């Protein structure tokens, strides 16, 4: 799975979850509960919507060792809108299929008068230069040292060098900070582009995430 927590239109009572799964997986559900429910005894499950995603397939890209290649990225894109949540709570969730269960992910709903966020931008994930991602996560570690209780992450775009390279998104989403927070942000030009600007579309950003559809047209 390649999983990320995104904002819903009203994050005090809803949250959007996005993930990609292999096309051979026939069924996925999301299981979620309050974080304090250590044994998942009060968990709820829901089915989600899915569609076949092909927008990243055969996009010209690059591997971590510098080898040029074309992305092999046809997968099932799942979107789950968790609703009727309680404000000011920490939740956890996991993805369950007939084949495997994901790690546990967490997020906090909004609603408090006071909150804090980690703000980050322009780290341009690029596997041949792994230090870019490492340095970005190290910066977040420092923010966490200063404020262990920050609630969510705001990114200001250009977090991926080539948004059309799905393998770049996959590597980034494996990081621990993507498992513990909701990430809200905007799409920069790099998030919308493929290598060398061969193609430029916000479909890359859209299919790598699950944002509410209440923004401007397109």
Task: Provide a role label for each language-model segment.
Residues 12, 23, 136, 194, ...:
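A structural signal for well-ordered alpha-helical scaffolds and beta->alpha junctions
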Residues 72, 79, 90-106, 167-218:
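Extended active-site neighborhood of metal-dependent phosphoesterases/phosphodiesterases
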Residues 1-126, 146:
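Acidic, histidine-bearing metal-coordination/catalytic regions of metal-dependent phosphoesterases
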Residues 133-195:
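Core catalytic region of metal-dependent phosphoesterases/phosphodiesterases
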Residues 27-28, 40-43, 140-142, 175-178, ...:
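Short, surface-exposed linear patches
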Residues 17, 63, 118, 154, ...:
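Generic detector of intrinsically disordered, low-complexity, polar/charged segments
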